[in-house]
């Protein structure tokens, strides 16, 4: 199985400009290719991971990746299938975000070894050297307005309005391809399927300006089995930055993937061999309640993104919380595992009587209910049941001198911080 056949088998090929020619190029020698990442935030997220891992698969097959950080295009904003104009960021912010994204990409691509080691480029380096007049003369003249208006990504915005700034974005992305081809002999661009219009602007410019053929391959935008856009948890992006989405939260995200998606995602997001995945699928279908596919997915992706120690910690947090063993976890581990539960910062004037604190922290709705909860054995401090109405919270209840975990019943948690 050649690399293109493997990508297809994993569900990673959505569209290509000329499949036969691309397969020929990939099987006959080393291909230099690029994927672009606009710094629209200070971290990449799971939505980017499909293209990143596809790039890594091609590198493992001997081809040479260029990771383009859009320091210039990030200042403009990509209109592709967006309902409204993006807010423009300052140059300083985009530069800072660009540096962070560069660091994240080095986790996945090999920038150090072999003749196909990855290269980092930033399109601000060339766009900052081009005057507006030169850009119109040397690039703009190759694009008709009719051609630009025909792009689906632009059509969607015509009714609501699109600025010239965003309208020109596709020409800038097209010029990226031309520049990388001219300087580095890059002949293939990889990106999400929503980028097709912008990406083919590059092949058009290559053909008209340099009389060369470039290839485009898009990866699918991943949705779950209900059609919902993938990569968000409770409406929020799942970030690759551990400070924005902890390894535990990422672990839980994968653990909760629906059965109908789990095996497909193993093909897309892991480097397990396809025959290994087929074996996992057989075991998974025989006992879905054991969630083997989801557990494997969580292990592989968290290890890939954050390392084996982070995976082991996420697994330990999961197991200890499930068992109610609060005291077996550090304060930092509890902050990860209980990041979504109510948090109350204890004030110096607060009563430390347990009944009072249950009401103050919003755990019980009233003192009467709080007393009943304590007497009925429904209240736990750091996993231990407390039934003393006169119980006073003390330093002994602080884990690592930072927090106390209170549970009401089986599932209602609250964290007291000091």
Curated annotation (Swiss-Prot):
EC number(s) stated in the UniProt entry for this protein: 6.1.1.1
GO MF term (any one): RNA binding
Localization terms from the record: Cytoplasm
Binding site for ATP: 232
Keywords from the named record: Aminoacyl-tRNA synthetase, ATP-binding, Cytoplasm, Ligase, Nucleotide-binding, Protein biosynthesis, RNA-binding
Chief place of localization: cytoplasm
Domain S4 RNA-binding: 352-418
Position of sequence motif 'KMSKS' region: 229-233
InterPro entries: aa-tRNA-synth_I_CS, aa-tRNA-synth_Ic, Rossmann-like_a/b/a_fold, S4_RNA-bd, S4_RNA-bd_sf, SYY-like_C, Tyr-tRNA-ligase, Tyr-tRNA-ligase_bac-type
GO CC, alphabetical: cytosol
Catalytic activity: tRNA(Tyr) + L-tyrosine + ATP = L-tyrosyl-tRNA(Tyr) + AMP + diphosphate + H(+)
Assembly information from the UniProt record: Homodimer.
Protein name, UniProt field: Tyrosine--tRNA ligase
Organism: Streptococcus pyogenes serotype M28 (strain MGAS6180)
């Amino acid at each position: 199985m050649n690399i293109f056949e493997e990508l297809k088998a994993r569900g990673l090929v959505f569209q290509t400009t000329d499949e036969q020619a691309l397969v020929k190029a990939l099987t006959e020698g080393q291909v230099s290719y690029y994927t672009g990442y606009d710094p629209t935030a200070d971290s990449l997220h799971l939505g980017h991971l499909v293209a990143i891992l596809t790039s890594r698969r091609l590198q493992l097959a001997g081809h040479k990746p260029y990771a383009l950080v859009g320091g210039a295009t990030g200042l403009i904003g990509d209109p592709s299938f967006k309902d409204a104009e993006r807010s423009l960021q300052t140059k300083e912010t985009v530069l800072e975000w660009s540096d962070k994204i560069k660091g994240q990409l080095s986790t996945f691509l090999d920038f150090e070894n072999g003749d196909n080691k990855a290269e980092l480029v930033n399109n601000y380096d060339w766009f900052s050297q081009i005057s507006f007049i030169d850009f119109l003369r040397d690039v703009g003249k190759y694009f008709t307005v009719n051609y630009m208006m025909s792009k689906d990504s632009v059509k969607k915005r015509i009714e609501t309005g699109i600025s010239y700034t965003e309208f020109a974005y596709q020409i800038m992305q097209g010029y990226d391809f031309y520049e990388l081809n001219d300087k580095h002999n890059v002949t293939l661009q990889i990106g999400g399927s929503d980028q097709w219009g912008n990406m083919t602007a590059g092949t058009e410019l290559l053909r008209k300006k340099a009389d060369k053929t470039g290839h485009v391959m898009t990866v699918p935008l991943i949705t779950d089995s209900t059609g919902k856009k993938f990569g968000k948890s409770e409406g929020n992006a799942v970030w690759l930055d551990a400070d924005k989405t902890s390894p535990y939260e990422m672990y839980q995200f994968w653990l909760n993937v629906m059965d109908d998606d789990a095996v497909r995602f193993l093909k897309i997001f892991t480097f397990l061999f396809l025959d290994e995945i087929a074996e996992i699928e057989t075991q998974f279908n025989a006992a879905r309640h054991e969630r083997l596919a989801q557990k494997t997915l969580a292990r592989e992706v968290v290890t890939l993104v954050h390392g084996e120690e982070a995976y082991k910690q996420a697994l330990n947090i999961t197991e200890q919380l499930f068992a109610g063993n609060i005291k077996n976890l550090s304060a930092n581990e509890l902050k990860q595992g209980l990041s979504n539960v109510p948090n109350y910062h204890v004030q110096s004037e607060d009563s430390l009587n347990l009944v009072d604190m249950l009401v103050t922290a919003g755990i019980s709705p009233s003192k009467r209910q709080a007393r009943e909860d304590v007497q009925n054995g429904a209240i736990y401090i750091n996993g231990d049941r407390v039934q003393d109405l006169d119980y006073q919270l003390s330093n002994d209840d602080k884990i690592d001198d930072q927090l106390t975990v209170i549970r009401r019943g089986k599932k209602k948690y609250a964290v007291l911080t000091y």
